[in-house]
Design a protein with these regions (language model features):
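Extended alpha-helical scaffold segments
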Residues: 1-107
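Short, charged, low-complexity loops and linkers
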Residues: 28-39, 82-91, 114-118, 280-290, ...
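Alpha-helical solenoid scaffolds in eukaryotic proteins
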Residues: 28-36, 43, 84-88, 92, ...
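Extended alpha-helical "rod" scaffolds
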Residues: 42-56, 60, 64, 94-96, ...
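Extended, low-charge, aliphatic-rich alpha-helical segments
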Residues: 81-85, 89, 104-187
Length: 433
């Protein structure tokens, strides 16, 4: 310990930063021990701790194997050895290890954040892989010490770093003002801004996955190394805290995606507003003409493609799917309101069904997740508006609904039936739904 000046080194680290995980000093270059030299010392300490653990097990087994002595002597001798000078030295070394490992982890995570840069042919920046590599390395080394206290300390430090400095770094770009204006400067999507925004969201998405992978790996290793139930319970508690960071990153991601959608939807809204002017009180000639000259669906899909699809190559598959689904939610909500204000002939109901099918078909090709549930209410409205007579609804309602789950309430079903120009209000009111 004196040869490596561990007490002095630990004092320097504590003096440099009383709280190693203080968010306020992230990214600030400070004078102190060189993390590369600290890593070499950590590897030496690791070897000492492993040897110490082996020696302790050897001595305890020897003491317990003394069969020719007083049976009461072995427990006393074991206790005496575990509280003796050798154990005290091991304890001191463990304390130094925790301080040095904490310092090494913090300094390298901060450095990864500080030198974060775009990586060619990657959807994320360098910070993501670098930070999780540092955390993985430190936690693996902590487990290799075979000391549960060391593992708990390093695990807590890792969780704290992720929840503070790393979390802050992930969100920093999304707080930039006028992001929407920069994304569509001059009326078209700006590739550079789109790449920057998409990369920030990708960082959040991948970080959420990496947290769960790291948690799983540490859990597996700890189960092998620490069989005692009490030790496993301690690890489980810390891992739960680590796992919560995946949820935190997902929440930040969802907020970021909603922010992105809010910059895109105003560019689609004019096409949606035009839908309000389209008539659904159709004659056979008008219905036939709509089949050739689509009134609005293709225009809406073109607006979505123009303003959203160009971001696909810049985003993770998961993020792009979520992005498109948020746009769908916006569209469907607005379309439901618009359709509830219209009047329909039976052919108009058939037209709405055709429109819904076209929307579902196109959006299904844009995303890997199912979109049918998003259009369920609109599709059910179309089904109702396409009926021959009011009483036909009973063929689809209640016990007759089959595999279909109704998303419309009985009151909404009556309201939709009331949109048909040829359905009598008395017949609708008489329905038992």
């Amino acid at each position: 310990m004196e040869y490596r000046r561990l007490p002095k080194l630990s004092s320097e680290i504590n003096a440099q930063n009383m709280n190693l995980l203080d968010v306020g000093v992230a990214g600030v270059g400070s004078e102190g021990p060189d993390p590369r030299e600290v890593e070499l010392i950590l590897e030496e300490i690791l070897s000492l701790m492993q040897l110490g653990e082996d020696y302790t097990e050897f001595m305890v087994s020897k003491i317990k194997g003394l069969s020719n002595v007083d049976p009461d002597l072995a427990p006393r001798a074991t206790k005496s050895f575990r509280s003796g000078s050798f154990s005290k030295v091991v304890q001191d070394i463990t304390g130094f290890y925790v301080i040095l490992e904490g310092f090494f982890m913090v300094e390298n995570v901060r450095k990864a954040i500080r030198i974060d840069e775009h990586v060619p042919d990657s959807l994320t920046t360098s910070m993501v892989d670098d930070v999780f590599y540092v955390l993985q390395s430190c936690l693996r080394r902590a487990i290799s010490t075979l000391n549960i206290s060391s593992v708990i300390a390093v695990l807590s430090g890792a969780s704290s770093l992720l929840s503070n400095e790393y979390h802050e770094a992930l969100q920093h770009k999304m707080r930039e003002p006028n992001l929407g204006a920069k994304l569509f400067l001059g009326g078209v999507g700006v590739q550079k801004t789109g790449t920057e925004i998409a990369t920030v969201l990708n960082n959040m998405d991948v970080s959420s996955e990496y947290v769960l992978k790291l948690k799983h790996e540490i859990e597996e290793q700890c189960l092998e190394v620490f069989p005692a139930p009490a030790d496993r319970e301690k690890v489980k508690s810390c891992l739960s805290e680590l796992g919560d960071m995946s949820i935190t990153f997902k929440q930040a991601l969802n907020a970021g995606l909603e922010q992105l959608v809010a910059t895109v939807t105003p560019r689609i809204r004019p096409v949606l507003d035009n839908v309000a002017t389209i008539s659904y009180e159709l004659s056979e000639a008008e219905y036939a003409d709509n089949e050739v000259n689509d009134p609005w669906v293709q225009g809406l899909l073109h607006a979505v493609e123009t303003n959203a699809a160009w971001l696909q190559s810049l985003m993770t598959a998961n993020n792009y799917d979520s992005f498109i689904h948020l746009i769908i939610e916006f569209l469907v909500k607005r379309l439901e309101v618009i359709m509830m204000q219209k009047r329909f002939s039976q052919l108009g109901g058939l037209q709405l069904d055709r429109d819904c099918r076209a929307l579902v078909s196109h959006f299904s090709s844009m995303t890997q997740r199912t979109v049918r549930d998003k259009f369920a209410r609109l599709t059910q409205m179309a089904t109702i508006l396409n009926l021959e007579k009011v009483s036909e609804i009973l063929d689809f309602w209640g016990e007759n609904s089959g595999p279909m789950t109704w998303r419309l309430t009985p009151a909404e079903v009556r309201r939709v039936l009331g949109l048909r120009v040829d359905f009598k209000s008395e017949a609708i009111a008489a329905l038992k739904l």
